[in-house]
Structures are given as C-alpha cells and as structure tokens.
C-alpha cells in the first residue's frame, strides 16, 4: 500500500523547486484566474516557516504591504505556482520565524548569508 501511494505522489511532485529555508527572501509567481483570463501574480517576502511533508509540503511567506503585515501560505508542489526565485539567503538560527510578526522596521531585518 505504501509503495502504491508513493508512486501516485511522485507523479504530482515538481522537479524544479529551488532549495530554500526560513529567513530567505523569495519571489513566488502564482497563476491567478480572473474570469476567463489567467495571469501571473508575484508575491515577494521572507520565508518565516517551512513544513516538509512530502507532497503536502508548504511554506509561509511574509511581507509588509502599505504598513500592514501580509502572510500567505503556499503548497510547494501546487500546480498554481509558476516559479519560485530566491532573491537573497538569510542567516537565522530558528526554523520558525514567527517572532517577526511582532517586529517592525529595522528590528524585523534579517542578516544576509554570504555563503
């Protein structure tokens, strides 16, 4: 039974996913359906959480838009994701950066990894 499920999941997995972690700044390009038109919308922010669960893997991206914090959760293998670009690598010590929700301005910055 396990092999059967694994084979089905492998059909739906994406192969071209870049390797990123919490603290990285990324741009996620998503397919948006408006009426009968399809277009690509970009969402740029910092990855504050990543959940690795095979086909159900997801990540949360946070950005500040007009002074308000906006978070969006994406499934990594979703067919609605067109592309994921890494803008810069962040240097953090924690896997979940939920403490950024209460920070504003300079205290919400993350050091850049030079590796």
From Swiss-Prot:
PROSITE patterns: RIBOSOMAL_L19. Signal peptide: none annotated. The keyword Ribonucleoprotein applies. GO terms for biological process: translation. Keywords: Ribonucleoprotein, Ribosomal protein. The keyword Calcium does not apply. GO terms for molecular function: structural constituent of ribosome. Pfam families: Ribosomal_L19. It comes from the Bacteria. GO terms for cellular component: cytosolic large ribosomal subunit. This protein is located at the 30S-50S ribosomal subunit interface and may play a role in the structure and function of the aminoacyl-tRNA binding site. Belongs to the bacterial ribosomal protein bL19 family. This is Large ribosomal subunit protein bL19. The gene is rplS.
